Every structure is written in structure tokens, then in C-alpha cells.
Amino acid sequence: RFLSSKTRPDDIAVIIGNADYKKQGKDIPNVTPAYADAGGIKEYVKQALGIAEENIIFLKDATQKDMISTFGTGTNHKGRLFRYLVPGKSRVFVYYAGHGAPGEGDSNYLVPTDAEASLIDLNGYPIKTLYKNLSKLPAKSVTGGLEACFSGASEAGSVINNASPVYLK
């Protein structure tokens, strides 16, 4: 239970819990705690931040299409999130639990549940696009949290077979 906050009718949250990568028949391991983590964050934003249920975009197992329609593309930032907010008034909270993956060069991606590991540069959602589009929102503030590893490895195995993961001992 969290301390209650007054209701903030203009504030918005996007919460994504990507856990079930196997249902798409892809070669990416599941992220077991992602649903529970996203559910806990949803309760937090409702109780502690005062965000109304109808102002929460809650996505379980978001596909590339879901992420694009929510956050926009590299050339159009006016996705679903943009349309929810009240310019200059809305505070935006974004949370993602799921896989992250390295791409070519210095690029990193959120991994949609329908992604193919060998094609992550084509079907991942670029972190640079996420940050760029969030920075273009006419919001009062934007707060984000990414619960994802970008090493290319997970407890259940390699996310990206050709990646060279970094391990801490």
C-alpha cells in the first residue's frame, strides 16, 4: 500500500509489462517478473501519484505496433500518449519492464514481444526514438523508468545470439 495522493486528472502513465515472448513463437526467453512489476507500478501511480485509471495506458506483452502507436515513430511523435495529454498541465510517467537489446553501433532497443532477435535493428523499438519523442511532448514533466537489461543476455539465456553480453561478478 502506498500513501495516497490527491487525484491529478491531467496526469498520464504508460506502463508496459513484456513477459511472454514465447507465445509469439520467437527465440527470445520470457521475462517472468515483468507482469508483477508492471502491476505494482500501476498501483503506485494510481495511489501515490494520483493518476486516474482512465489515464493509464497499460500494455501487457506490447508488440512493435503497440509501441509505435503509443509513442510514435522516428518521424512522427504524435502517438496515443501525445493525444492523451493536456499541453502544459500533464505530468507523464512511463515505465517499461521487459527485454532490452543492443543493436548495431551504439543503438539500443526495447524488445517488443513479437520481435525477432536476429532482426532487432528492424523490429525493436529504438531507445533514441523513445527519448526523442518523450522530449517533444508538451507536458509539464516526463518521468521514465526502464527495467530492462541491454547486454543481450538474461537468466533464461541469450536474447540476441550474436551479442557479446557483459557480466558483472
Located regions from the model:
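Disordered regulatory segments flanking catalytic cores
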Residues: 1-22, 139, 159
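Cofactor-binding loop segments of dinucleotide-utilizing enzymes, especially the Rossmann-like FAD-
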Residues: 16-18, 61, 97, 147
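Terminal peptide-recognition signature
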Residues: 17, 41, 94
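Short, intrinsically disordered, charge-balanced linker/junction segments flanking boundaries
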Residues: 163-169
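Functional beta-strand-loop-alpha-helix junction segments that form "active/interaction loops"
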Residues: 1, 35-38, 42-90
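Hydrophobic/aromatic beta-strand patches that form the interior of the parallel beta-sheet core
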Residues: 14-16, 57, 143-145
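Glycine- and acidic-residue-enriched helix-capping/strand-helix junction motifs
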Residues: 22-39, 43, 120
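Caspase-like (clan CD) cysteine peptidase catalytic core
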Residues: 10, 68-159
